[in-house]
Swiss-Prot record:
SUPFAM superfamilies: dUTPase-like. It comes from Saimiriine herpesvirus 2 (strain 11) (SaHV-2). Signal peptide: none annotated. The keyword Lipid biosynthesis does not apply. This is Deoxyuridine 5'-triphosphate nucleotidohydrolase.
Length: 287
């Protein structure tokens, strides 16, 4: 039988962006049509207008880029998140920056993830909500992050969970990014290495046991190590090439579906875990 491309339905309310990707694309692309002011020393949270009303088996990556001197937090979006996707934008300079029409490009892509069983809870915490993709990573020691420079933190800790064919990848927490602290997307290999960037004007100290990052176990097919000409790719950081899943993003206004197929049943959520719903910014919330 021919492969059936998974369908992912979304709602779109055009406010700041319009969609540039074709119907049924596997990379949902947007570009701004309204000006966006990104103030110096402040965090700007931009609504994309995209909502996934149904839980899926895929996790998502929200990625933004611009030729202007800004940084967009790479967002890990959990399958159970049903709120509006919002992009966290930070200013690299000491002056306000205006993103004019077509200055900010955003993409939403899907990937396959795994949830391994933990045998050691000292560094990782299992997902908090039903259908969460990310594990919370605790800081093993105190760390001080200086403003406006890369801060490298390394500790000789191997990932306490292993899953065949899946690789642990670190993402920054949206809650901390919303306060000005970002983390470079990176692989957790022989040792834990985190590169922080503090976009505030003050030094920040985080104590041991702070939930500092998200770790997601991404299928290795999304992390090609050789040249791939047949699959489109993008860089989540200079050392991480990412190839997204082949899915079909469909606007429910264009491809209407029956309500029972669109909305998740309460039976999908286990008794021991809550459903995320629209809490937070897609993964780690705002706390």
């Amino acid at each position: 039988m021919p492969y059936k491309v998974p369908e992912i339905y979304y709602r779109f309310e055009p406010q700041t962006f319009y969609i540039t990707s074709p119907a049924r694309a596997s990379n949902l692309q947007l570009i701004n049509h309204n000006n966006i002011l990104v103030k110096a020393g402040q965090v700007t949270i931009v609504s994309t207008g995209i909502i996934f009303p149904k839980e899926t088996s895929f996790a998502f990556i929200l990625y933004g880029k611009s030729a202007k001197s800004i940084f967009c937090h790479t967002g890990l979006i959990d399958p159970g998140f049903q709120g509006e996707l919002k992009l966290i934008v930070l200013n690299k300079t000491e002056d306000d920056i205006t993103l004019f029409e077509n200055d900010l490009r955003v993409s939403v892509t899907a990937f396959v993830y795994g949830v391994p069983k933990l045998h050691d809870y000292s560094d990782l915490c299992p997902p908090r909500y039903s259908k969460d993709a990310g594990f919370d990573l605790y800081l093993p020691t105190d760390v001080t992050v200086k403003p406006r420079v890369p801060n490298r933190y390394s500790v000789n800790i191997c990932c306490p969970a292993q899953l065949k064919s899946y690789k642990p990848v670190l993402f920054g927490r949206s809650g901390l990014a919303a306060k000005g602290l970002t983390i470079k997307v990176s692989r957790w290999q022989n040792q834990l290495q985190i590169i922080f960037y503090n976009y505030t004007k003050s030094q920040i100290t985080y104590t041991a046991r702070t939930r500092i990052a998200q770790v997601v176990f991404m299928h290795k097919k999304h992390l090609p190590t050789t040249l791939t000409r047949l699959k489109p790719t993008m860089h989540l950081s200079e050392n991480i090439k990412y190839s997204w899943a082949r899915v079909s993003f469909q606007d429910i206004k264009t491809f209407p579906v029956q309500d029972e197929k669109l909305y998740s049943s309460s039976k999908d959520t286990s008794d021991s875990q809550m459903s995320r719903g629209d809490a937070g910014l897609g993964s780690s919330g705002l706390m």
